[in-house]
Amino acid sequence: FEYLKVDFTSNGMVQADSYYNKDVTTAVEAYNEGFSHFISEVDKGEPMFIALSIAPIFPYQYGNSRRIACDTWGKIGQSEYSLNAVSGGWWTNEFYQYNDPDHLVLVGNDADKETEGENRARITNGAVSGMVLVSDNYSLEDKSGRGDAKLSRERAQKILMNKDVNEMADFGRSARPVYGYREYNDKGDGAENCFVLDTEKYLYVSVVNYKDNQIAGKVALERLGLSPSSFSSVKELWSGDDVKVGKDGLSYTVPGKDAKIYRFLKK
């Protein structure tokens, strides 16, 4: 499909002393009038995906997606920033078709390139948010000097071709934080690191490690709405390994600056 990004739309919600239409007296009225006209013009052409950025949550009916984290690149701190928005705002996917985690960059412009673990974390970020829009320089004859086209192509072959992870992203739904109150840094200003997405066939548990060192933990089955008899198998999607889950819950270990996705096959 074709898409159109409409940026800084919150500026159209600023209250003013007067408006072009003198019958309009509030910012919300002006926003609705302007966007209604915009959408009516867009609808005269081919179907268009409208991606809103730096946009108010309401009114929501003018966009297919709303960017929840802006100017987000590929380092692990950027994934944490984006997933912080999912931690507190996953529910906006209930009315916007997609929560947009920003373009998913594998290799940026810094001399210190992103690790493959950071790449997995960033694409997990997209799958958890329910929207994947990749953004690297993949040129075969690059003359821009931006990024590293050869490395981006190599990483894309490794990271973006995972069928199971892509299938999760294809649901287009935002996962929810497993706990809703447990920030990774215990300071009240960070993202959660465990997210759950429940579908008809599968239940996905994503664990992202924002720290430099390995983390380990356990998620109780009850917390996931599961019982030992409600699933038949568990697979970790990035490695492809089968995982044994006991009655006491899902035990996980995640290397520093990396992510894992556990997929429960429901009975």
Predicted regions: what they are:
Residues 1-17:
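Active-site groove signature of glycoside hydrolases
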Residues 12-32, 38:
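Aromatic- and acidic-residue-enriched carbohydrate-binding clefts of CAZyme catalytic domains
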Residues 12-18, 59-62, 215:
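Extracytoplasmic/secreted cell-surface and envelope-processing proteins
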Residues 29-147:
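Glycan-recognition surfaces
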Residues 117, 123-185:
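Aromatic- and carboxylate-lined catalytic core of secreted/periplasmic carbohydrate-active enzymes
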Residues 126-129, 134, 183-226, 257:
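Carbohydrate-binding surface patches
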Residues 222-240:
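Solvent-exposed beta-hairpin/edge-strand motifs
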Residues 245-267:
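C-terminal beta-strand-rich structural cap/linker in extracellular carbohydrate-active enzymes
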